[in-house]
Amino acid sequence: MQIKGHRICGGRATGPALVSKDAISFLGGVDPGTGTVIEKGHALYGKNVKGTVLIFPGGKGSTVGSYVIYQLMKNGVAPAAMINIKAEPIVAVGAIISGIPMVDRLEQNPVETIKDGDTVTVDGTAGIIELS
């Protein structure tokens, strides 16, 4: 199944979905050395974003979050791709400077349509995702 969206950052990646209904603060919410979500009370607390297609409504918190996403990439623990309901500048810039394929504004709500563990391919260049 293909779902059309809006391109944020080009590229193509496939991975298992990691889905959250909670917004993510990368600064203080995700350990840049390990990729583990460390924000207490977060739906993904204790889970690791490495190699996943990370699906969440959008970002929250400090503008430094862009650089935390970049650190995740430099440390080899970044998500393979990201999907937001509606991206905001912090996460979008983080994806762009890190070269992480990213889309938002899909025709269907990704948080409701996609389940943890589903195999998802993000074609950031075309603004399309594929579920298999």
Swiss-Prot record:
CDD domains: AcnX_swivel. Pathway: Isoprenoid biosynthesis; isopentenyl diphosphate biosynthesis via mevalonate pathway. The active site is at S62. The keyword Transmembrane helix does not apply. Coiled coil: none annotated. Belongs to the AcnX type II small subunit family. This is Phosphomevalonate dehydratase small subunit.
